[in-house]
């Protein structure tokens, strides 16, 4: 919490003393302020206010306190926030302007004799306490004597606080009262204490107007209205960004269906590729099986062929032998040339065997064959008989 600077001054015009100076003290928070009624010089204090009363001044008056800290009754009265004190005020600087409208009733002074300038003395003030962020100020009372224009002014207190959170400090109402006087325009001016708060959070600054209680006097104008105009720096506030915020759960829920669809598509593509590959493999294996089956059959046929070749060869040989040297019958060359036919399918081989049988029957039924068979038999017998005598010869030769 920033430093609290309170500026409080009271000006009282008394007809019994000469014009002098009164001091404006700046009390610290938590310490009571007591001002004694004695003339003080401006050397002892940092801020001094001088006033010269004019008993004959009439008409509307607007009082203001300029920052020069010296005023006259007819000059505008300015309450300067941030007058020269021991410690400077923190930024932002806030000014409070108090303007008082006086009624148009002319001021009447019952005494014809003029009085010399009276000193301005400060009356006793109540204690000023600060408790829990609330400023309370007891209402001081001033008294005027017989004549003159008693003017009571109370300088407003300034309180500036800077914080980030929490409500600002509340303000106390400053009320001044003037006692009854015989003559002169009793004027009571009260300026409300101003409080500004700069922060990011918390309610704005609240202000209460000071109460004015003019005393009853014989004559003289009285305060009709008080205008309180305050210039404050605006409080800073943080605006939320307009970008919509998405919950991560909603994002995950939105992404879940997309992930499921992608997974399903990937599975479908993989299954389709697997089926195509399997079908292609089946086609390749079927062609291989068919080709292998043909080869196996060919191998079996080729193996069966050579196994049956000697039998058919023997038949052909016998037929050729039966034909003899005459050339009737099938020569060996034809048999050898017909061997490749035996390596074909069984049907063709059977048909070939049938044709051979028919040829044998035809050759056997022909008369020429019978005539020819006889010499063949005879020749065979001769051939058989021929070595028979050799055997005895051999035997005979072997015997001796």
From Swiss-Prot:
Glycans are attached at residues 21-22, 26, 28-29, 35-37, 41-42, 46-48, 50, 58, 69, 99, 103, 109, 113-114, 136-137, 173, 178, 239. It is found in: Membrane; Cell projection, Microvillus; Cell projection, Uropodium. Residues 21-51, 58-112, 121-164, 172-182, 212-224 have a biased composition (Polar residues). The keyword Ubl conjugation applies. Residues 21-224, 320-400 are annotated as: Disordered. Residues 277-400 are cytoplasmic. GO terms for cellular component: basement membrane; cell surface; external side of plasma membrane; extracellular exosome; extracellular space; membrane; microvillus; plasma membrane. A motif (Nuclear localization signal) lies at residues 282-296. Cell surface of thymocytes, T-lymphocytes, neutrophils, plasma cells and myelomas. Residues 196-211 have a biased composition (Low complexity). Residues 20-253 are extracellular. The chain crosses the membrane at residues 254-276. The modification Phosphoserine is found at residues 291, 336, 351, 355, 368, 379. GO terms for biological process: apoptotic signaling pathway; cell surface receptor signaling pathway; cellular defense response; chemotaxis; defense response to bacterium; establishment or maintenance of cell polarity; immune response; leukocyte tethering or rolling. This is Leukosialin.
